[in-house]
Amino acid sequence: MRYLLILSMLGLSIFLSACGSSANSTGAKEAVEDYVNALASNDEASLSALSCADWETSALTELDSLQAVTATLDGFSCQQSGTDGETALVNCEGKMILSYNDEDQELDLSTRTYRVVEQNGNWLVCGVQ
């Protein structure tokens, strides 16, 4: 009986750990998707809210560089690719199309890996590599 109880508790803890990892992976992925969408739509308030304090200035500088263009996303999706200690690593696919004076330039979104951290229950972008 005691052996069965220990096995049940072990199974439950593994199940709950797997559920927690899935939720964390989704949270980091969604944070990056929201962050890139905020960049594309020139949404400064959302971009600030989705950035950790150490990254916010860099995020706003990147947003400033997009002020003269119209940005749209094409084939955009993200997924968590791994972790680095407490940091989730998220990669995206697709491209950001930047339009200026009827000319388009494409930015390949797969060239960046976003560093995402959880702070106070919120996933925040905290750098790129």
Predicted regions and their residues:
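Exposed beta-sheet edge and beta->alpha loop/turn motif
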Residues: 85-129
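Hydrophobic pocket/interface hotspot
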Residues: 35, 46-47, 116
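Bacterial signal peptide processing site
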Residues: 20-23
